């Protein structure tokens, strides 16, 4: 952010309007300014009656002239290539720009390359997919029929689209195919959309740009009460209304009484989300209206329609529930039902007293219930599912393998071991076979044979099927009683010895039952394979699972009657034999016949499985496939990452393999001890001057004011770097990444002091303009910024912030971390140490607080420490703790000679932000402590407000100035932030490698390095963590990095991209400073268990989750070449506390990631599925380790089947990491660490997860950070008291700066030194914060005496000088009035009242400029050439006859031509006395100073004080009651010179209206009674003879309420 330019509202194109192709769509209808009631009189473009802004230059009222001008422009465009930059005349030049000046003097201005900038880039034709915002806005305002071919609705469908990222429209025949059928522009935009807040920002600025300024500016759309939209309800676009009253993508507000959050579709605003507004009917900020345009909060009018029901001021306390505080939905009802047996009074007995604690406990029990259910489900799938669906399968014995100790009967195998035949028949007591076993006795030897024919069952299923031919009763038997061998052939048969059995024993054998009162044992079924059934030597068939031996039908006894089918079956028939005949039997209705066959011919059962058993096997193998697949893919992808990708990331030095191995060995040695310094070769030496004379560097600028035109040539195109961005076609056309800030043609925002074309850098002055602009504070001893060609590592540098969050660390820990960051090899000109001390706390055993420790490590403070005051900001807390205060100390890092040798002590800028708390918490144990997340949001929100120019607190204003004063770089130049914990030591080249990755690939939005353990062998607790750290990086993160989706960037060592370049036209996309990320990450209403675990314990991982959710197509990477070391817990108690926080936050963050639909991949082959498996695996860790131990123990038990598959799976899971170590790092020592880790698996997978789940409602940091006097019962984030926003004032940077300068006396209260330029162009043109007075604010007069600050002393100008320069010169000098007050510049007008407050508001409401302050021309009322010896009073230029006019870099003055210079020439002594000031005039047109023609207005920088409006005359602006005339003596008459001059020009035409400049956005503050958006009115134009119109004598009578009169003492 340029401290002298108005910050951009978004990364919007700035200059000119969007040119159309010659064959493009017809011109769209004009945009009616929201809130205006007038309609266009001209169908093409005509001003509404109540249009509160000045029409843009070149506006013609006649339609024919408009059409003629458009046709000329289209003919010029048709001669250009489509992708070529538009000609200067193809766009409406911004007011006050150099292009407008050229258009006024020359019909063919010199074409040049446009300046590329983040803030206000030269606008190329925007390439969109679908309708542009302008077309949509025109559609909203168009009242014509949809069928009208000239209506804007038709234009909506004809918008040309050429966005290669979003696909191409159908009529773009230059492309053969569309990239994607997904149309992001057709998404439903509601508050749940991942880019809801960011798109509202963009839409908000579109409305403001189209309205020529900040019409109806609302408070921040990402702050404490998001107000989505800028235009009032009913402005013509209200027909397309989205959630919250806002138009999806356009940001139109709804009715003022609609609750914020979106028409009931979003959760209502709860406690803590109230707007930082003021009381009703009071001014929004504390300064008076003379120093800012204000929006007054007015009550809703009682006339007209009856007002609707008001919104409660605090929606969070309007409703409460008996179940629990906070939101109550299905989840909370489930938790309450689950714990209904534990009412509140019962919980209070056990110390759970507050309703918030009881809610957290109930939610914890609900989660434990779900976790238990999931573990039970996993156990059921592992062990119980097979038993349930498959059951206990009977034992089966394959036919042909039955031993001699058993016999088969009707398909069942019976054991005859120990069987003694009863004493009947041949086995009688008096026979030789008494008490023998027939299976072993001759002649039977029936062992292994089929004895079914010995126990034939007569009747039953065969009744009526087989009968005697002669009739009568059932036959005695069907077959002869013989034995049958297993191959189906006959066995022993003796007709003389009866072998048939009758009685009950027959039924028992036929049914396969266990014989009663017998030693026979049923073993199981006899099974046959399908190859046995299809054997052509046998006649077998299968019916309902039973195998039938059809050959036995040949042995049927004679005299039996049976169906003819049996005659067919007893001979082998391919239609029946060898097949499953079940279906054929059912079709032919032969069930009875085959049931009889099953009774008499069954020999066994087909070897098959039930459907349940099949399902169990499918489940088993699918699980194996997924588990083994994921494990194997992770392993191979990690190997691929280690072999082919990891060494390329950040390898800017193109190291060889030997160099990489040497560096890895040095890092391993360095990581053994936390205090061991890195090898000296990696740490750069500090530069020392060898002479007492100052040495000038070609990169440094000792005095920014000494730069002259042509001091630096533009960077040659041959210096362009070939990055991934340029290869993809998104690089800057001038080379490198799109520049955003630094003032280098084609440079990044990193090259900050190199002057060129950019318009967003704080040092963005053009060398052509001769000097830098003015800075708000003098700069002393800042580190010079190198030029764009300075590439020490082969890539363009990017400004980076090294953020260190400190809480209760020791002195040694902080010194170690800051030493490592300060001695990194990254240039000090592009890095800033930022230490945020989270409260005034003392660590256990420490005598001084953490902020004091940090302050003791600083030197050369910009402001002495004793003079630093605390400033308020809105903290991330609840209750009164939302108000917090900070002290900002800016200086340089102070080394300790005992830790860093002098030769390595570089000069590094450092800022300390110490949270000191409010006076209410001065006596607490931790005043100012708000948590690490608050420290991160403090920086993120600040960067967002800087990028979007939103209202900021006093702390953020001081933070902005501190960064500027200590670095000389504006905060918006910073692109990367490195987050480091205060107990971490960074390897010297780690920052350079991280920045190299982000510069090379703009799609990377975050990355982390490898964290090594410095105390590996201290205790057994540290030893078990070594391999766990290693494998989490080189396997888990390496696998995720292959897809660019690392799900956890550790907070101890990670880098994030603040903003990313977008396209070749200088646009920037906020990443870390994105409104959606800041809005969700700064959630202060943490009232559910899920939110508390996300935001209070796992804030680092949640930030990664938010970035992946918001930007799922961007990359999160792991860079193993960037290394740090840290101290891990060395006692089990601390480890238990740490892992409790990590495990619980992991569970809740993985749940958030599972809900992201846009992660790469599809279904099972997606990162979302991998995340789901990780979430399930984390929840069932205790059950998994229990099952693992069960499988291992079972494998060693005898007589138990060995679980082969689970053992193989276990070996793969545990063994592959060891193989990974060997094949990637070749660090054999880690194999030993792996064995130690395997022995500690019960601790990692059972003890720690169970402890974490049971303490999920504990939100304290436990033993990890011990603070003196801390109450262990206090949970982090508890609400206490009520937040009072009246102590916090929020203003825009320009308002703070204006107030500071007024109070300090640097400028008069009405100075437009920091005025903000506004234009009426639909696309905001030009830069924003330009000075319209002389940039040399301390040298208003070119002659005379000056004080020590460079200010002109009273009466310093001699009369001769005054007469030489004409009557106007005396008006410019900063002389003092008799009362001692400094007189203000005559050429600088006063601010005026807002339009609705002025007495003549109704007369000028039709065409007055909205919120403008006019910069008048010189006293001459004619555009005739000025006298050659007169200078512009507002610029304080030197006379044409100045003795210094022919100095270096200055052009001679021709007669009749007025000249100017941005900075008057001064000698060296003046420059030394004068405070160093940096640039602010980031001009898009860096041409050298030239002669100004007689018809041109005087131009300063790129702000022209004259613009012509052919259709607007001064007569349209009547006299005003409150004027803004320069201060003159009302009784004084015009001097003779004036009279003569006015008389000479009395016949000249009336001077065109001077263009005004809007100071600030002044938007209303939301209230329960609605908001009436107040617009600032315009001052009237000056009359032809301004000298004849003195201002009223009473200068205070017309001041608005609350405004302080000017001081005259």
UniProtKB/Swiss-Prot annotation:
Membrane topology, as annotated: Multi-pass membrane protein
Induction: Expression is slightly lower in the yeast form than in the mycelium and shows a maximal expression in the log phase at about 14-18 h of incubation.
Annotated InterPro entries: Chitin_synth, CHS4-like_dom, Nucleotide-diphossugar_trans
Residues linked to a glycan: 654, 1015, 1144
Biased composition (Polar residues): 34-44, 100-111, 147-163, 1502-1514, 1530-1552
Comp. bias regions, Low complexity: 61-82, 253-267, 742-752, 1568-1588
Protein name: Chitin synthase 5
């Amino acid at each position: 952010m340029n401290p002298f330019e108005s910050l951009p509202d978004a990364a919007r194109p700035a200059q000119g309007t969007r040119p159309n192709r010659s064959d493009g769509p017809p011109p769209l209808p004009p945009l009616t300014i929201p809130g205006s009631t007038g309609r266009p009189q001209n169908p093409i473009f005509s001003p509404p009656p109540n249009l509160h802004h000045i029409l843009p230059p070149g506006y013609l009222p006649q339609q024919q002239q408009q059409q003629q001008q458009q046709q000329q422009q289209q003919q010029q465009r048709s001669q250009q290539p489509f992708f070529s930059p538009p000609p200067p005349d193809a766009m409406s030049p911004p007011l006050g720009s150099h292009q407008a000046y050229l258009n006024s003097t020359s019909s063919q201005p010199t074409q040049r390359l446009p300046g590329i900038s983040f803030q206000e880039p030269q606008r190329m034709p925007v390439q969109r997919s679908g309708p542009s915002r302008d077309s949509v806005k025109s559609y909203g305002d168009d009242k014509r029929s949809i069928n009208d071919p000239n209506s804007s609705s038709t234009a909506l469908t004809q918008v040309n689209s050429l966005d290669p990222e979003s696909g191409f429209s159908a009529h773009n025949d230059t492309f053969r195919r569309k990239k994607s059928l997904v149309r992001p522009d057709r998404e439903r935009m509601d508050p749940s959309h991942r880019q809801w807040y960011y798109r509202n920002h963009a839409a908000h600025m579109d409305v403001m740009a189209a309205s020529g300024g900040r019409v109806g500016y609302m408070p921040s759309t990402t702050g404490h009460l998001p107000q989505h939209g800028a235009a009032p309800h009913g402005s013509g676009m209200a027909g397309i209304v989205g959630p919250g009253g806002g138009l999806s993508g356009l940001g139109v507000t709804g009715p003022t009484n609609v609750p914020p959050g979106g028409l009931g579709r979003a959760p209502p605003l709860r406690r803590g989300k109230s707007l930082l507004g003021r009381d009703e009917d009071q001014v929004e900020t504390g300064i008076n209206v003379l120093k800012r345009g204000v929006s007054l909060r007015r009550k809703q009018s009682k006339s007209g329609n009856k007002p609707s029901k008001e919104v409660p001021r605090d929606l969070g306390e309007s409703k409460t529930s008996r179940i629990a505080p906070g939101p109550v939905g299905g989840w909370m009802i489930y938790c309450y039902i689950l714990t209904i047996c534990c009412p509140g009074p019962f919980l209070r007995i056990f110390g759970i007293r507050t309703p918030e604690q009881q809610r957290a406990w109930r939610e914890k029990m609900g989660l434990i219930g779900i976790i238990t259910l999931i573990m039970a489900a996993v156990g059921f799938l592992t062990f119980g599912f097979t038993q349930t669906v498959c059951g206990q399968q009977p034992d089966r014995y394959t036919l042909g393998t039955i031993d001699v100790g058993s016999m088969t009967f009707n398909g069942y195998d019976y054991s005859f071991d120990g069987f003694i035949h009863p004493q009947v028949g041949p086995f009688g007591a008096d026979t030789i076979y008494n008490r023998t076993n027939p299976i072993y006795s001759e002649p039977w030897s029936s062992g292994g044979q089929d004895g079914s024919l010995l126990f034939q069952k007569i009747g039953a299923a065969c009744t009526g099927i087989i009968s005697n031919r002669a009739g009568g009763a059932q036959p005695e038997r069907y077959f002869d009683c013989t034995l049958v061998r297993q191959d189906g052939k006959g066995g022993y048969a003796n007709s003389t010895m009866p072998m048939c059995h009758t009685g009950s024993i027959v039924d028992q054998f036929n049914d396969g039952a266990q014989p009663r009162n017998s030693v026979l044992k049923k073993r199981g079924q006899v099974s046959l394979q399908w190859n046995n059934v299809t054997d052509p030597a046998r006649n077998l068939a299968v019916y309902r699972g039973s195998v039938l031996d059809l050959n036995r039908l040949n042995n049927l006894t004679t005299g039996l009657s049976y169906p003819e089918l049996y005659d067919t079956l007893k001979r082998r028939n391919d239609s029946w034999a060898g097949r499953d005949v079940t279906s054929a039997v059912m079709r032919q209705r032969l069930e009875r016949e085959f049931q009889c066959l099953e009774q008499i011919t069954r020999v066994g059962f087909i070897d098959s499985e039930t459907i349940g058993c099949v399902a169990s096997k499918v489940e088993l193998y699918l699980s194996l496939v997924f588990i083994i697949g994921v494990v194997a893919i992770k392993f191979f992808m990690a190997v691929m990452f280690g072999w082919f990708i990891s060494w390329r990331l950040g390898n800017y030095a193109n190291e060889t393999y030997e160099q990489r191995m040497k560096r890895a060995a040095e890092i391993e040695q360095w990581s053994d001890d936390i205090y061991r310094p890195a090898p000296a070769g990696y740490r750069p030496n500090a530069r020392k001057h060898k002479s007492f004379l100052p040495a000038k560097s070609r990169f440094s600028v000792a005095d920014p004011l000494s730069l002259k035109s042509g001091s630096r040539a533009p960077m040659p195109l041959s210096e362009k770097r070939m990055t991934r961005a340029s290869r993809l076609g998104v690089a800057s056309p001038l080379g490198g990444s799109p520049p955003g800030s630094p003032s280098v043609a084609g440079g990044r925002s990193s090259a900050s002091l190199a002057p060129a074309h950019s318009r967003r850098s704080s040092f963005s002055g053009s060398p052509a303009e001769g000097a830098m602009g003015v800075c708000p504070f003098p700069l002393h001893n800042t580190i010079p910024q190198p030029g764009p060609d300075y590439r020490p590592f082969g890539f363009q540098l990017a400004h980076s912030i090294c953020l260190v969050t400190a809480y209760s660390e020791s002195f040694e820990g902080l010194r170690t971390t800051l030493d490592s960051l300060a001695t990194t090899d990254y240039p000090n000109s592009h890095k800033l140490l930022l230490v945020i001390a989270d409260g005034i706390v003392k660590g256990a055993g420490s005598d001084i607080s953490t902020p004091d420790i940090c302050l003791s490590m600083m030197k050369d403070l910009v402001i002495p420490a004793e003079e630093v005051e605390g400033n308020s900001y809105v903290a991330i807390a609840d209750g009164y703790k939302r108000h917090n205060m900070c002290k900002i100390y800016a200086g340089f890092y102070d080394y300790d000679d005992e830790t860093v040798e002098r030769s390595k002590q570089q000069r590094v800028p450092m800022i300390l932000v110490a949270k000191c708390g409010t006076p209410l918490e001065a006596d607490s144990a931790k005043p100012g402590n708000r948590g690490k997340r608050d420290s991160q949001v403090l920086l993120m929100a600040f960067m967002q407000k800087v990028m979007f120019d939103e209202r900021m607190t006093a702390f953020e204003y001081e933070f902005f100035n501190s960064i500027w004063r200590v670095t000389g770089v504006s905060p918006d130049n910073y692109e990367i932030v490195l987050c480091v914990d205060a107990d971490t030591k960074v390897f010297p080249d780690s920052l350079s490698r991280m920045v190299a990755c982000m510069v090379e690939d703009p799609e990377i939005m975050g990355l982390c390095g490898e964290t090594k353990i410095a105390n590996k062998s201290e205790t057994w607790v540290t030893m078990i963590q070594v391999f766990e750290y290693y494998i989490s990086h080189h396997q888990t993160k390496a696998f995720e990095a292959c897809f660019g989706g690392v799900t956890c960037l550790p907070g101890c060592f990670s880098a994030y991209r603040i903003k990313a370049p977008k396209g070749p036209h200088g646009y920037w996309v906020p990443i870390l400073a994105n409104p959606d990320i800041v809005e969700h990450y700064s959630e202060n209403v943490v009232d559910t268990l899920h939110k508390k675990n996300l935001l209070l314990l796992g804030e680092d991982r949640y930030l990664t989750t938010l970035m992946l959710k918001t930007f799922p197509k961007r990359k999160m990477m792991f860079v193993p070449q960037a290394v740090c070391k840290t101290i891990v817990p060395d006692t089990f108690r601390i480890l238990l506390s740490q892992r409790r926080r990590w495990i619980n936050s992991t569970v809740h963050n993985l749940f958030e990631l599972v809900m992201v639909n846009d992660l790469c991949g599809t279904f099972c082959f997606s990162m979302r599925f991998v995340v789901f498996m990780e979430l399930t695996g984390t929840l069932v860790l205790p059950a998994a380790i229990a099952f693992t131990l069960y499988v291992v123990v079972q494998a060693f038990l005898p007589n138990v089947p060995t679980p082969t598959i689970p053992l193989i799976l276990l070996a793969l899971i545990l063994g592959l990491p060891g193989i990974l170590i060997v094949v990637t790092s070749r660090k054999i020592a880690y194999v030993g660490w792996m064995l130690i880790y395997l022995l500690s698996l019960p601790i990692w997978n059972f003890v720690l997860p169970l402890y974490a789940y049971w303490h999920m409602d504990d939100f304290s940091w436990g033993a990890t950070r011990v603070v003196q006097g801390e109450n262990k019962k206090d949970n982090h984030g508890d609400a206490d008291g009520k937040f009072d926003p009246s102590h916090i004032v929020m203003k825009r940077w320009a308002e703070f700066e204006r107030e500071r300068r007024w109070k300090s006396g640097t400028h008069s209260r009405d100075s437009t030194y920091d005025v903000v330029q506004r234009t009426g162009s639909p696309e905001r043109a030009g830069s924003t914060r330009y000075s319209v007075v002389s940039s040399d604010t301390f040298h208003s007069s070119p002659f005379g005496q000056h004080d020590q600050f460079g200010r002109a002393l009273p009466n310093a100008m001699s009369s001769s000088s005054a007469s030489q320069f004409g009557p106007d010169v005396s008006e410019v000098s900063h002389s003092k009035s008799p009362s001692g007050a400094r007189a203000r510049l005559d050429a600088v007008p006063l601010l005026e009242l807002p339009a609705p407050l002025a007495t003549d508001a109704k007369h000028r409401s039709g065409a007055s400029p909205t919120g403008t302050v006019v910069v008048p021309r010189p006293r001459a009322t004619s555009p005739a050439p000025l006298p050659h010896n007169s200078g512009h009073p507002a610029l304080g230029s030197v006379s044409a006859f100045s003795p210094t006019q022919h100095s270096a870099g200055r052009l001679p003055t021709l007669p009749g031509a007025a000249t100017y210079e941005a900075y008057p020439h001064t000698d060296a002594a003046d420059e030394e006395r004068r405070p160093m000031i940096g640039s602010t005039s980031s001009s898009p047109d860096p041409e050298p100073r030239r002669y100004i023609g007689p018809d041109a207005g005087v131009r300063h920088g790129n702000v022209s004080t004259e613009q012509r409006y052919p259709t607007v005359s001064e007569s349209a602006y009547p006299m005003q009651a409150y004027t803004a005339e320069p201060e003159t003596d009302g009784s004084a008459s015009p001097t003779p010179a004036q009279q003569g001059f006015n008389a000479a020009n009395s016949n000249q035409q009336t001077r065109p209206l001077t263009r005004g400049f809007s100071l600030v956005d002044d938007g209303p503050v939301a209230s329960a009674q609605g908001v009436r958006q107040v617009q600032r009115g315009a001052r009237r134009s000056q009359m032809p003879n301004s000298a004849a119109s003195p201002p009223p004598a009473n200068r205070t009578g017309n001041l608005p309420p609350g405004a302080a009169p000017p001081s005259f003492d």
